[in-house]
Amino acid sequence: MLDIKKIRADFDGVAAKLATRGVEKEKLEKLHDLDIKRRELIVKSEALKAERNSVSDEISQVKRAKGDASTQIAAMQKVSAEIKAIDAELAEIEENLNEIIIMLPNLPHESTPIGADEDDNVEVRRVGQTPTFNFEPKAHWDLGEDLGILDWERGGKVTGSRFLFYKGAGARLERALYNFMLDEHGKEGYTEMITPYMVNQESMFGTGQYPKFKEDTFELKDDRGFVLIPTAEVPLTNYYRGEILDGSELPIKFTAMSPSFRSEAGSAGRDTRGLIRLHQFHKVEMVKFAKPDQSYDELEKMTANAENILQKLGLAYRVVALSTGDMGFSAAKTYDLEVWIPAQNTYREISSCSNCEDFQARRAQIRYRDEDGKVQLLHTLNGSGLAVGRTVAAILENYQNEDGSITVPEILRPYMGGLEVIK
């Protein structure tokens, strides 16, 4: 959530930055007008409350003197009625103001490329050689079905579209990958967590999924309204919701593997086959809590942690800085890692690493006490390390052989009982 004080102090600057994220200036002007009216009413209310206190003192003095306080009582009743009316108007204005501000995205960092959509993203670097084949490479869904390790037909029968069964070596490969990822992040100082797979709506608000992206989630239809997590970012970030941390302990780094549940609203017709876009998938997440002056260094380190996984798996990838028009709601800066998918002859997203600055911390009220004892908002960061199903897809396609078998990357073989080839 944005700081209303920042909007107040630099309205034109904030409006210009939000315009690059598709926010119309009229919306911000309405917010600005409501804020002015709100502050005027607060001043008026406080003045009337001071007047009411003064009249109350007069009434006490008159009564002590055995006098007639009816005039003062009438005056106080009039003032009290005015205060009640102002406070009611103030509550309505604050509700309207809040409805606007919670729907505004984060301000982009100065280094974030300005653009309308993914076409304006900027490639930062490419790492690794894309493989060459002396045969026509198959898509991972065909490879998985032919090997009997991925079963979409029965996944569709049991549940519906965008669901599948991993079977045999396929299930073992998935498990090997997330265990490998967690081990690697543990070496980098991340504390491994197992989180709840359902969260309350306050948690979804804290990280910015609610209310704007409610349609993208699966929510339980009961009086509790729990939500199946779209990413472990939600429970990990909200772990410290409403708390004040010791600044000397920052940065704090968490990692977790969890299922992620997404309705994929608006994705009809996109990636209808394969592991790229599912309603349920495993993902290893990284989350950091950092001091504001250290958060961008921590973003680079987090991105390097995600890259480390791809490098050790021997997968070619590129790093892309997302434009203001393509970046997620809560992010100030985001790097996407895109892995090479041979059958599609292109790079596809496998990780997003973002610095949300104090945007989520303000919504979730996560603060720290600095060395001077001052309490202030910290910065939150999150990143995929990695999306496991998409990593399976990348391995199947990049490590496929002409006979349809899959060579298991060397780094994973100890996690798969020494298995060298899936056939």
UniProtKB/Swiss-Prot annotation:
Family, as annotated: Belongs to the class-II aminoacyl-tRNA synthetase family. Type-1 seryl-tRNA synthetase subfamily.
Cellular compartments annotated: Cytoplasm
A Pfam family per the record: Seryl_tRNA_N
Residues binding ATP, per UniProt: R262, S263, E264, E349, I350, S351, S352
Gene: serS
Function recorded in the entry: Catalyzes the attachment of serine to tRNA(Ser). Is also able to aminoacylate tRNA(Sec) with serine, to form the misacylated tRNA L-seryl-tRNA(Sec), which will be further converted into selenocysteinyl-tRNA(Sec).
PROSITE patterns linked: AA_TRNA_LIGASE_II
Keywords of the record: Aminoacyl-tRNA synthetase, ATP-binding, Cytoplasm, Ligase, Nucleotide-binding, Protein biosynthesis
Catalytic activity: tRNA(Ser) + L-serine + ATP = L-seryl-tRNA(Ser) + AMP + diphosphate + H(+); tRNA(Sec) + L-serine + ATP = L-seryl-tRNA(Sec) + AMP + diphosphate + H(+)
Protein known as: Serine--tRNA ligase
Note on domains (UniProt): Consists of two distinct domains, a catalytic core and a N-terminal extension that is involved in tRNA binding.
Oligomeric form and interacting partners: Homodimer. The tRNA molecule binds across the dimer.
